[in-house]
């Protein structure tokens, strides 16, 4: 997908880039597959900020995506390719022969008019088809991978994302995840063949602060620019270092310090993710 640049009518617009929208074929979304999603803007149920530097952003409607892909044995045809304001990849509207319509993530190379299907086994290894991991050949690239059978895809769903099937061990299948982590997943879990499209999304330059605000991202203030009451790095006469290792506003080391808690699923990790 082509990267679009702009005429530098302002300093911020000089370096701003965006993706060409020529691949989008729909002028309007299906109303039955839209819903209003209340936005928390980083607040919890008490109204207190639990995730800093977040806001609501531009008003938008949520597209209901079929992550489960559980219409087994029913062929679907890609009707449209659409923009989704909640995602960095495109979505496809699939019309099934039984009259049902669902949105799915658009895999790279899947176009309008293509046929897709879900089944436990026996399908061609074709982009967009969904099968159980135990029935997909070793070396295949997959996305929208379940971690628990029937719970819907949770892994490799962002633009350009994929995991690779590395082998089988009993009831488990070993995967190399986008982070570089090697992990066992139950062979009964579903996965979709191919990689997620819109892989050039990571090359976009935001270009100006207002565009980040539309995305729901608020400015970040350096701790060294605060007062001592607000941050451990704050205070001092003029610009000064904090005299300690970098920490969060609550005093936790913030560069390279491991904070992951132990959990039962740790035994399924073969090798940890790469930094």
Curated annotation (Swiss-Prot):
One of its GO terms (biological process) is cytoplasmic translation. It holds the Pfam family Ribosomal_L2. GO terms for molecular function: rRNA binding; structural constituent of ribosome; transferase activity. GO terms for cellular component: large ribosomal subunit. Keywords: Ribonucleoprotein, Ribosomal protein, RNA-binding, rRNA-binding. Residues 257-275 have a biased composition (Basic residues). InterPro entries: NA-bd_OB-fold, Rib_uL2_dom2, Ribosomal_uL2, Ribosomal_uL2_bac/org-type, Ribosomal_uL2_C, Ribosomal_uL2_CS, Ribosomal_uL2_dom3, Ribosomal_uL2_RNA-bd_dom. Residues 218-275 are annotated as: Disordered. Part of the 50S ribosomal subunit. Forms a bridge to the 30S subunit in the 70S ribosome. Belongs to the universal ribosomal protein uL2 family. One of the primary rRNA binding proteins. Required for association of the 30S and 50S subunits to form the 70S ribosome, for tRNA binding and peptide bond formation. It has been suggested to have peptidyltransferase activity; this is somewhat controversial. Makes several contacts with the 16S rRNA in the 70S ribosome. This is Large ribosomal subunit protein uL2. It comes from Sulfurovum sp. (strain NBC37-1).
């Amino acid at each position: 997908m082509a990267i679009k640049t702009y005429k530098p009518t302002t300093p911020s617009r000089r370096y701003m880039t965006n993706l060409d929208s020529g691949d989008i074929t729909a002028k309007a979304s299906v109303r039955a597959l839209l819903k209003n999603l209340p936005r928390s803007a980083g607040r919890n149920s008490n109204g207190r900020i639990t995730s800093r530097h977040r806001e609501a952003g531009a008003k938008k409607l949520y597209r209901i995506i079929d992550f489960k892909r559980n219409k087994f044995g029913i062929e679907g045809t890609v009707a449209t390719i659409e923009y989704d304001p909640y995602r960095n990849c495109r979505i496809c509207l699939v019309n099934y022969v039984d009259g049902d319509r669902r949105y799915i993530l658009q895999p790279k190379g899947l176009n309008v008019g293509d046929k897709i299907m879900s089944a436990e086994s026996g399908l061609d290894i074709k982009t967009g088809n969904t099968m159980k991991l135990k029935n997909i050949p070793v070396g295949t690239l997959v996305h929208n991978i379940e971690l628990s059978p029937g719970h819907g895809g949770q892994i490799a769903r962002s633009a350009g994302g994929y995991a690779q099937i590395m082998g089988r061990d009993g009831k488990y299948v070993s995967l190399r995840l986008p982070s570089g982590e090697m992990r066992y997943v139950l062979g009964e879990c579903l996965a979709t063949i191919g990689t997620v499209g819109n892989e050039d999304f990571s090359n976009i330059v935001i270009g100006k602060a207002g565009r980040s605000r539309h995305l729901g991202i608020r400015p970040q203030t350096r701790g060294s620019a605060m007062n001592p009451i607000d941050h451990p790095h704050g205070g001092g006469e003029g610009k000064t270092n904090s005299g300690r290792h970098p920490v969060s506003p609550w005093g936790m080391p913030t560069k390279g310090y491991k904070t992951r808690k132990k959990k039962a699923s740790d035994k399924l990790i073969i090798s940890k993710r790469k930094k």
